Design a protein with these regions (language model features):
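The feature encodes the CheY-like receiver
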Residues: 55, 85
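Two-component/phosphorelay signaling modules centered on CheY-like receiver
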Residues: 11-29
């Protein structure tokens, strides 16, 4: 079963994302960038679902760190953020960003279908 790491500081949203995805994927969650790094070190995910606005350590710093290691630089990343409209997809492609969802407009079926498509490439 493919593994997804959800990095979301809002625990309720993280639980909602897990409910949407858990029937098809093995899910782990991290509520901060620091916790995400520990999770990734323990169990390399096949895909990361990432919120950009995290407390403490910036998600952009996390993206830079992931790019600095061969084993993590190839992990596909899907962003789900309130800042989706402000993000430039083209400038984020070097970080292996595959899709950007606006949290307020994402539908469960759409999220699941996009993630399945990315993991089946």
């Amino acid at each position: 079963m493919k593994k997804i790491l959800i990095i979301e500081d809002n625990r309720i949203l993280a639980e909602n994302f897990e409910r949407i995805l858990r029937s098809n994927f093995s899910i782990s969650k991290a509520y901060s960038a620091q916790e995400a790094i520990l999770q990734i070190d323990k169990n390399l995910p096949d895909l990361i679902l990432l919120d950009i606005l995290l407390e403490g350590h910036s998600a952009f710093a996390l993206l830079n760190e992931l790019q600095s290691y061969a084993d993590t630089s190839k992990i596909p990343i899907v962003i789900c953020s309130d800042l989706a409209s402000e993000l430039d997809f083209e400038s984020l492609k070097p970080f292996n960003i595959r899709h950007i969802f606006d949290k307020s407009q994402v539908y469960p079926q759409e999220l699941r279908k996009k993630i399945e498509g990315i993991l089946n490439e």
